[in-house]
Design a protein with these regions (language model features):
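A structural motif
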Residues: 7-25
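Divalent metal-dependent hydrolysis catalytic cores, especially in the metallo-beta-lactamase
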Residues: 28, 54-57
Length: 151
């Protein structure tokens, strides 16, 4: 939040930026423009994700906007991503040819749902020993018999 520009969200095309709690109760509205780019480079972002126990997955890489490839045009060498997410609009085989020519990064699919009817339109199956973040991380790396299933 501190790395966002101090611009207000008062443009007519900006919808309410709701602040909610864990019970989905509205606590208020953010006056700051949350769609703006943060003053962080991509290496710092991935490092923060990993430091906080998360998985760094470049989302909807096949989209013409709001994706790693639309912004940079490539994966920077040394960027420690855990996976690349492809929308249902592109086949995984085609995405493999276009975005990453080897198996160094797994390709995954998620719903990226913005409306209830879109939930479940895409998914990824994993072989895990337990339902934990560490197991997901191991599956992304293909270690210890864990894996990401390509469909």
């Amino acid at each position: 939040y501190r790395k966002l520009p101090e611009a207000e969200a008062n443009a007519p095309f900006i919808k309410d930026q709701v602040i909610v709690n864990q019970d989905d109760e509205v606590l208020g509205f953010s006056p700051r423009f949350l769609l703006a780019a943060a003053a962080l480079n991509i290496f710092d972002i991935v490092q923060l994700i990993h430091r906080n126990g998360g998985l760094a997955i470049a989302s909807h890489i096949d989209r013409e906007s709001f994706s790693l490839f639309s912004q940079l045009g490539f994966i920077p060498p040394g960027l420690a991503l855990d996976a690349l997410e492809v929308t249902p609009l592109m086949s995984l085989a085609h995405a493999r040819r276009v975005f990453v020519s080897d198996d160094s990064l797994p390709l995954v699919r998620f719903s990226d749902s913005h409306r209830p009817e879109e939930i479940g339109r895409a998914w990824t199956e994993f072989r895990l020993a337990a339902k934990t973040w560490n197991e997901l991380r191991r599956a992304m790396k293909g270690s210890g018999g864990r894996k990401v299933y390509r469909r």
